[in-house]
Amino acid sequence: DRSRGLGDVYKRQRNIRLALLEADVSLEVAKDFVNKIKPKALGQEIIRSTSPGQMVVKIVNDELINLLGSENTDLNFNAVPPVSMMMVGLQGSGKTTTTAKLAKFIEKNKKKKVMVVSLDIYRPAAQEQLKLLGEQHNINTLPIIEGQQPADICRRALSAASLNGSEVILFDTAGRTQIDLQMMSEIKQIEEIINPVETILVADSLTGQVAANVAKEFKNTVNLSGIVLTRSDG
């Protein structure tokens, strides 16, 4: 009956809100999400259904798809080559590995010659790590010059790409253990030099609300165009 159907729907809504909070989703986002599904979940056809709980699950699934984006958006290559793309994120997010994987994807699926460039002069062996990953994936890597600053590496990369025929340059920026003023100032300077068509944030999905806060900080500093969530298979 109607009262039983309503009870089932309200119970599901409470469970959904609790599940989101336990998954480290912020209270604001959890409330907003439940409020979005509430009008549909309380619709007459749902209440009168023989299985209102299952119909609520479908509504939640549809809303999650809508929230995350129901359409695939391709990378933007709409610029005069070499096209620059900037990878940003905190240290340990998997940014360098993602940079190499993205380079391989572009070469294989988009048939474009890619060069990867490490701007991380702070983390020990960070530049060597990208060089090794480039060799493993057969991707061209900008040669390392010890002591060169990120801004100068950017300018050298742009010149090198024009000479070696690279159509896309992926710049792997330095990460930090936490966001600080120096980091953001450096990334802003890099953005001004390379004028990237894509600025992609790489974030660890297991950090929960931290990832959302990091995204806000980067969005306030640079023209963030996309996000890659690592470790999302767990």
Predicted regions and their residues:
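Single conserved hydrophobic/aromatic residue that forms the stacking wall/gate
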Residues: 1-10
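A general alpha-helix detector
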Residues: 12-20, 36
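Nucleotide-state-sensitive switch-loop elements of NTP-binding domains
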Residues: 22-88, 93, 97-214, 222-225
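Phosphate-centric recognition/catalysis
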Residues: 230
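Canonical P-loop GTPase G-domain recognition
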Residues: 233-234
